[in-house]
Regions:
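Alpha-helical protein-interaction modules
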Residues: 34, 47-140
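Amphipathic alpha-helical protein-protein interaction segments
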Residues: 15-22, 39, 93, 97-104
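Eukaryotic helical DNA- and histone-tail-recognition domains of regulatory proteins
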Residues: 1-37, 49-68
């Protein structure tokens, strides 16, 4: 999905701090979406889509963490025995999560990289910038 690619492209300290994208990042993302697809999405529409993707990702992630659930990378969907789904369905507030019982979510891995990566730490040393990310150091 092009939006996810743009979000990942802007997932750098100059455009994103404290888990939020900057105004410049959003402006760039909206402009590039509108240019690529010859549309006129508003900033609010694009932000809402990002929030919808984030909510869906968190819902699936929470289910993957539940006992008895797993993630099928090939089919890009949750898997669990019927008894696990039945037990889960009996709980309160499970309606949104049950949505994923028979649906794939092809954006799960890409969104995991976007929302679950460790916090970026940037240090400026002798005119060099170092990004510390998931135990890797990248010098620019």
């Amino acid at each position: 999905m092009f939006l996810i690619d743009l979000l990942k492209e802007h997932d750098v300290p100059v455009f994103r701090t404290h888990n939020a994208w900057s105004k410049d990042a959003w402006t760039n993302i909206v402009n590039r979406l509108n240019t690529k697809f010859n549309t006129s999405f508003s900033l609010g529409q694009v932000k809402q889509k990002e929030q919808d993707l984030k909510k869906a990702y968190r819902s699936v992630k929470d289910l993957v963490a539940e006992s008895g659930f797993g993630w099928d990378k090939e089919r890009m969907m949750l898997h669990a025995p019927p008894s696990v789904w039945a037990s889960f369905a009996a709980r309160e507030n499970s309606k949104d999560a049950l949505h994923w019982q028979d649906r794939s979510f092809p954006y799960y891995d890409a969104l995991a990289q976007l929302y679950d990566s460790e916090t970026h730490i940037v240090l400026s040393i002798s005119d060099s910038v170092f990004f510390f990310f998931e135990n890797m150091v990248i010098k620019f």
